[in-house]
Amino acid sequence: MNEVLKIEHLSHIYSVGSPFEKKAVDDVSFSAQRGEFIGLIGHTGSGKSTLIQHFNGLLKPTSGKIYINGEDIFQSKEMTRAARFAVGLVFQYPEYQLFEETVYADVAFGPKNMGLDKDEIDRRVRENCRIVGLSEDVLDKSPFELSGGQKRRVALAGIFAMEPEVMVLDEPMAGLDPAGCADVFRFIKEYHEKHGTTILFVTHSMEYAAQMSERIIVMDHGHILMDGTPAEVFARSEELIEAGLDVPQVTRVFLELKKRGVPVDPSVYTVEQAVAQLKKLKGGCAKC
């Protein structure tokens, strides 16, 4: 892996110099390697949504730098434009991104603006609509006739079709029922496995972060509170709870067991890890 995205001492202040001045992001630095799957978590107001809008130049930082493949995205208009193709952003509410007359035209919008030929655009539209489970007969429909879940699929397909180097997904499961969440989870994992794209998955749900991420960044009051593997982050579960964040249900159970004197490791975050620990505790084999 090599570094594809680098954030260096980034701060963002809204309404500078006014009575409403507010620092939303405070001196944040981190980098993302090519192919990494990163969960970015934090409670409402932690600064995560403001932060991600800098990655492709939608917001300009009050101070600090954003680099894509070693290039400052604000060094020129050309670099800022290139960043918008290199970093795909799916907002929490897909209706913010859908505007064309048909699903096909909406998914094709990004590839068309990249200057791709018609055959390549058509391939990308159809392939990525298939990945997100949209049938051919939907392509000629207006996206505004679709259900919320289908709109989410169209928004994902539109970003997938651009084949960005970095994909940022802001609460992609928000508002979906359990079946819809499972579908979106599967689409994202399939795309990641096929393309090796760097993915930053923004969520307030520790359950989703634990299931999907190989690395978790925790934000609190505009700065990074934690950055590590899921095991490293959930080993500090009590700090997470103090910061107003939840932890996976299985982690919470093991925290309670430890408080009651049971010799368990409360950093578990999957059912499989919990079962293995309980088997060891009983003197059994964790592989049984």
In which residue ranges do the predicted regions lie?
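The feature captures the beta-strand-to-loop junction immediately N-terminal to the Walker
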Residues: I41-H43
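ABC ATPase NBD Q-loop/coupling interface
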Residues: K65-A82
